[in-house]
């Protein structure tokens, strides 16, 4: 098979399965409204959970940062790209989440890949929740360490895997809030089992940070768990982009030496770090509390109104509210019908989710109003 035949065959297989991904250019994709092709839609696809992407205080911080530092960092943090703006943000994140150190990364994907690549060796073992994010599972698959996957949130299965002989170290990997189902990991139980087998715990809390817990400190804080490695991202609750790894002083020093994604990538712009500091200030404030309370009320309203629809509603009290349809074509058709009636939703299909569980991944944000939820419910009931 020549290259073009290989590529064509892969694309054809996706088309036949109604699994071909497409991008839609939008004029505005975050916030309450999505604008595309000169049309305005209620936006139920954004991860901007607290509605901070258009917050004037955060926008102003980015603008002022650009005026002070320029629009780029100019290099890797190991050369000239580590600014005082980065340093202060790392210190504030570490203090907020109760860790000795924080290290900034350009994305959550890069952070997850970097940590696993740097930490794991051939004699070690990675034990990951089977529904962990693609960045975690891909990094584990590429690692020289063997990967074992435990059934979703099944602590008993995890314990059995950890109990089998391992010549090196064991790293347990999970998410705080799962990106496709919106449910939460039983982190306290997972940490107890991990510690019983002398392992370390790595939690990706991309969808919990900023959104749940006291001052938005996330899933681990809420469950009174402190993993050895905590990954937080800034494209969801923070409304910006980027990520950080929270850890001990010695682990941070180790990652600075061996995390190639960190060493060989241009740092995020200092202006972005300034915007993230402003976002963190909002998240920790009374306004942040009010936004989280509003989001919780919207979630309650939605779940109360969707119970009698002929779809499976995931066990989620997070901003992620998946309606599991099952069939790929049915999910695509339903998403299109909702768009025609003014609600922008996204159909998620395999391989992102398991076969037979195609879904509408609905996301609610603090930018929504109660009437927006009522409109979504009205449209769903009309197409159920």
From Swiss-Prot:
Annotated binding of substrate, by residue: 21, 133, 352
Pathway given in the UniProt record: Cofactor biosynthesis; biotin biosynthesis
One Pfam family recorded for the sequence: Aminotran_1_2
EC number: 2.3.1.47
Modified residues (N6-(pyridoxal phosphate)lysine): 236
Residues that bind pyridoxal 5'-phosphate: 108-109, 179, 207, 233
Disulfide cysteine pairs (residue numbers): none
Cofactor: pyridoxal 5'-phosphate
Coiled coil segments of this chain: none
GO molecular function per UniProt: 8-amino-7-oxononanoate synthase activity; pyridoxal phosphate binding
Reactions catalysed according to its record: 6-carboxyhexanoyl-[ACP] + L-alanine + H(+) = (8S)-8-amino-7-oxononanoate + holo-[ACP] + CO2
CDD domains in the record: KBL_like (cd06454)
Broad enzyme group: transferase
InterPro entries: Aminotrans_II_pyridoxalP_BS, Aminotransferase_I/II_large, AON_synthase_class-II, AONS_Archaea/Proteobacteria, AONS_Proteobacteria, PyrdxlP-dep_Trfase, PyrdxlP-dep_Trfase_major, PyrdxlP-dep_Trfase_small
Residue stretches spanning the membrane: none
GO biological processes: biotin biosynthetic process
Subunit record text: Homodimer.
Matching HAMAP family: BioF_aminotrans_2
PANTHER family: 8-AMINO-7-OXONONANOATE SYNTHASE (PTHR13693:SF100), CLASS II AMINOTRANSFERASE/8-AMINO-7-OXONONANOATE SYNTHASE (PTHR13693)
Similarity section: Belongs to the class-II pyridoxal-phosphate-dependent aminotransferase family. BioF subfamily.
Record-given protein name: 8-amino-7-oxononanoate synthase
Taxonomic classification: Bacteria, Pseudomonadati, Pseudomonadota, Gammaproteobacteria, Enterobacterales
């Amino acid at each position: 098979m020549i290259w073009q035949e290989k590529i064509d065959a892969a694309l054809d297989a996706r088309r036949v399965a109604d699994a071909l991904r497409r991008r839609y250019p939008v004029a505005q994709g975050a916030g309450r409204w999505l604008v595309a092709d000169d049309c305005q839609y209620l936006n139920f696809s954004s991860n901007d959970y607290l509605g901070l992407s258009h917050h004037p205080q955060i926008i102003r911080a980015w603008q002022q940062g650009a005026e002070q530092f320029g629009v780029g960092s100019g290099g890797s943090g190991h050369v000239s790209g580590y600014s005082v703006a980065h340093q202060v943000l790392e210190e504030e994140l570490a203090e907020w989440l109760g860790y000795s150190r924080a290290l900034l990364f350009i994305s959550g994907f890069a952070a997850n890949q970097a940590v696993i690549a740097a930490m794991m060796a051939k004699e070690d073992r990675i034990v990951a929740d089977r529904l962990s994010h693609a960045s975690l599972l891909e990094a584990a698959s590429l690692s020289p360490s063997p990967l074992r996957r435990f059934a979703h949130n099944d602590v008993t299965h995890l314990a059995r895997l950890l109990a089998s002989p391992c010549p090196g170290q064991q790293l347990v990997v999970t998410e705080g809030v799962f990106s496709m189902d919106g449910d939460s990991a039983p982190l306290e139980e997972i940490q107890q089992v991990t510690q019983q087998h002398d392992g370390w715990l790595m939690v990706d809390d991309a969808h919990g940070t900023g959104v749940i817990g006291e001052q938005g400190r996330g899933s681990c804080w809420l469950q009174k768990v402190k993993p050895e490695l905590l990954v937080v991202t800034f494209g969801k609750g923070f409304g910006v982009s980027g990520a950080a790894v929270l850890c001990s002083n010695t682990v941070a020093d180790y990652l600075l030496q061996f995390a190639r994604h960190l060493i060989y990538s241009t740092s995020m712009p200092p202006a972005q770090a300034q915007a993230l500091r402003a976002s963190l200030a909002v998240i920790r404030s009374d306004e942040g509390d009010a936004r989280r309370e509003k989001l919780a009320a919207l979630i309650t309203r939605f779940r109360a109104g969707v119970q009698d629809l002929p779809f499976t509603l995931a066990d989620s009290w997070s901003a992620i509210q998946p309606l599991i349809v099952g069939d790929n074509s049915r999910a695509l058709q339903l998403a299109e019908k909702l768009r025609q009636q003014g609600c922008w939703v996204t159909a998620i299909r395999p391989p992102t989710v398991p076969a037979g569980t195609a879904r509408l991944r609905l996301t609610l944000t603090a930018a929504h109003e109660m009437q927006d939820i009522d409109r979504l419910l009205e449209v769903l009931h009309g197409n159920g």
